[in-house]
Amino acid sequence: MRLVIAEKPSVAAALAAALGVKNKKDGYMEGGGYLISWCVGHLVELAEAAAYGEQYKKWSYDSLPILPQPWQYTVFKDRQKQFRILKDLMRRSDVSEVVNACDAGREGELIFRLVYHAAGCDKPFSRLWISSMEKSAIKKGFAELKPGEAYDALYASALCRAKADWIIGINATRLFSVLHGKTLNVGRVQTPTLKMLADRDAAITSFKKETYHIVRLDVGGAEAASARISDAADAEALKMACEASQAVCVSVRRERKTEQPPRLFDLTGLQREANRIYGYTAKQTLDLAQALYEKRLLTYPRTDSNYLTDDMGDTAVHIAALLVGKLPFMEGAAFTPDIARTLDSKKVSDHHAIIPTMELAKADLAALPESERNILTLAGARLLFAAAEPHIFDAVTAVFSCADTEFTAKGKTVLCDGWKELERRYRATLKGKPDAEGDEENELILDAPTFAEGQSFDSPAARVTAHDTQPPKPHTEASLLSAMERAGSADTDPDAERRGLGTPATRAAVIEKLVKSGFVQRKGKQLIPTKNGNNLVCVLPDTLTSPQLTAEWENALTQIARGAAEPEDFMRGIEEMARELVKAYPFLSENQKDLFKEEKAVIGKCPRCGGNVCEGRKNYYCEKKDCAFVMWKNDRFFEERKTAFTPKIAAALLAGGRAKVKKLYSPKTGKTYDGSIVLADTGGKYVNYRIELARDKELTQQA
């Protein structure tokens, strides 16, 4: 019997369908000589710091650095049942072989190996390595299973990555949290990402607007523009001089240019475009692509490749033909795909680029949720663009001299519209969504006029236009994903498995964590660092805020995965880094002590002592330590009346002793009514309230 372990239930179901395994059990499927079960993402993780001793349960400077030896592992509490199922299956006497069918990559290898070792399994295992959930790809993968030990070095690199992230993340987070008296999450990927947002925010804040002017001449129906002129009076003087002069063409340059089709999507590219066009967050796009993958309509989404493997040519041609018939914007388009330019096995790592699958033939796109349909269409459109002809045009630049000043006119003559025609067709269906990117502020891109050297225009009409220099734009998820992808790439081995900050699969989670931690806030599509976010990057050392650390790690991990470096050497360097970090920050400077001090929201005066009453997470309390006045947000009085004890109600009670509230619930009648909540404080341990109705009928209850 062969036990197959997938990364998630949906993948296990697809494997079972391809292998004809139909008998469903509790946590697995059985049939035809196969047992098919699954993890639920990570089932086993590195244990928390507290597992290594009582001294680590409380955060303190004296307990740092924490350097586990030996390492301990734990099963996620909410996934214990599935782990026990896998453990029991591995121990079955009729199971002779285990197949690692977790995602083909470094993280998938780690997920399987941790479960395998935690279960105490020593049976031989093999590796399934596929990029598509189509039946043909699954069957081919099972026919070409690799020995598990062939991926030992990959597992070693994955485990080193996890341990290194643990050591630096745990120690840096505890160190700076203890120093500043506030939980400050620090991570190898999220902290440099936050730094990029903070740097952009600082550039915007320090930006000083400058006005400049451009003089524009009418030369035979085309427009020639001057360089930028700072002074408005100088621009006006030039305009008048030009209108009294002759504009002479001094040079004409015609250049044949080719704009190649865009490459196929990797996950980051898909997330960028979906954010720009539809406003989807990176996490939303990943979730939608994953849902389509599990429906077998899209290939594996967590990829950093922009190409297909060389053997996928025929499949891609068939898929392109399906797309032409399925996508409305292709109706009437003359299109013959050139798939060859999308094929390059040497540029495919774990998984090929994201494209629709042959299941498209049977799919009813109209039946899909709109958001899933948008992502599938986006991926399909990109395959068609990538397989279309290049966009070829002649770029014409004509230079004129007038009033001893140079003016430039630009134009283009399109010779072959190519993939741009398909892109225009697609964008026309987007109904108000953004057009193609580009900024043509100072050049008029039209059909190129015909100019000749020596051609002149007497007293040309002229005008002056005023412009303001623009500050950098706040990062959107689209621009931040691009920045994360490029960060540190110049210092990273071209053959490294991961380049930039994070992986295609984890970048969305990094952004979400920054938002959830309160270091970043969303304003529409924009990502803006909060005050705490800006302060955090200011207090951390460059080693933690620069992508250089990730570049160095990835280079080392790549060598480990190749078997060219020892994991022990890498880990010794990580431990030394943690020791040096703790040693460098024994205390805070005076100007840093109050950086993260919470500003208390004062909502009124205490009725007992006259001190300030502030809002806490669970209550409203008097800030004077010797005063016991406190109003609890979850007070039974409010809960029974199904009324949220809001700051507005609390402020009214403190200001006037009463607050008018609508739709109070009556536990006796089950109906709602309007009335006033009256503060009836007697100075005891608990604060009392009562209801006052319009007809002066009162109901008193102690909280």
Give residue spans per PLM region.
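Intrinsically disordered, low-complexity regulatory segments
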Residues: 1-162, 166, 460, 470-471
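Conserved short loop/turn motifs at secondary-structure junctions
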Residues: 1-3, 101-104, 181-183, 254-263, ...
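Basic, low-complexity terminal or inter-domain segments flanking catalytic cores
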Residues: 2-3, 90, 118, 173, ...
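Amphipathic alpha-helical transducer elements in NTP-driven molecular machines
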Residues: 9-16, 33-36, 40, 76-87, ...
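Conserved ATP-binding/catalytic motifs of P-loop helicase motor domains
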Residues: 124, 194, 298
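C-terminal or mid-to-C-terminal helical accessory/interaction module adjacent to the motor/catalytic core
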Residues: 135-219, 254-258
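Metal- or metallocofactor-binding catalytic centers and their adjacent structured scaffolds
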Residues: 233-265, 271, 548
